[in-house]
Amino acid sequence: AGKTTTIRMIMAILFPDRGELRVLGHRQALAAKDRIGYLPEERGVYRKMKVAAFLRFVGRLKNVGEDAIDRRITTWLERVGLADVASKKCEELSKGMQQKIQFIAAVLNEPELLILDEPFSGLDPVNMRLLRDLIDEQHRHGATILFSTHVMAQAEQVCERIVMIHDGRKVLDDSLAAIGQRHASRQLVCEPLDPAVDLAALDALPQVARAEREGVRVRVTLRDDVEPAAGLPLVACAVPCASVELQRATLEDVFVDIVQEGRPA
């Protein structure tokens, strides 16, 4: 799609064929490297180096002061549950552990701009939550987070604003809240009081495109010209239900719709 390529251009690893990029007021990231943290998609630890030595090396590249660097390394290793690996070689760590070490390397200089390319790769659910909390913390402390992922659910959990790229072109750029309002789901989910109820009453409604069983629930898809809020009472009146709710459109739904329609949103 172009996500990682865009990040590499921001970081001056690659250079654009035309146009220009500005990062924190500079045309290249190199001029602002001490203010940027970058977690690449690929593993970037030096396998033969010990963890503390590797982090110290990265900190010095980012001009972290000698009086602060060891303190920050110790604090961060404790925070991610790796206090006992400081003297181990990076190659001795699991994939998930290496990912957490790379995250520490990205935030060691307390960056203003934190660029994360698939940061949850290799992490189990517990460590994914830990890393997500740490990312939120960086944002609360004033950092701008550029988060790249192909997993839409992760973007919904982390981001306030979404940019979607398809075939190298931007097809969506808006706040998560605005996207949710503009791409409202046309699907309702109801739980009939009688699980064996005949769906003919729903199919007969002119506002309904189709009704389908999903276990004890029924998924109702409204026609495109019907407001979702207007569909709720219609469904509830047609079939006695214990509950009826609007199914929220996910970012994955939005992306698929945009790609299938072949237009920017």
What are these regions (language model features)?
Residues 114-118:
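Catalytic Walker B motif of ABC-type/P-loop ATPase nucleotide-binding domains
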Residues 19-32:
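Conserved ABC transporter NBD signature motif
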Residues 110:
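Conserved catalytic motifs of ABC-family nucleotide-binding domains
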Residues 130-223:
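ABC transporter nucleotide-binding domain
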Residues 89-96:
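Conserved ABC ATPase signature
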Residues 11:
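Helix-to-loop junction immediately C-terminal to a conserved catalytic motif
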Residues 56, 60, 67-85:
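Conserved ABC ATPase "signature" region
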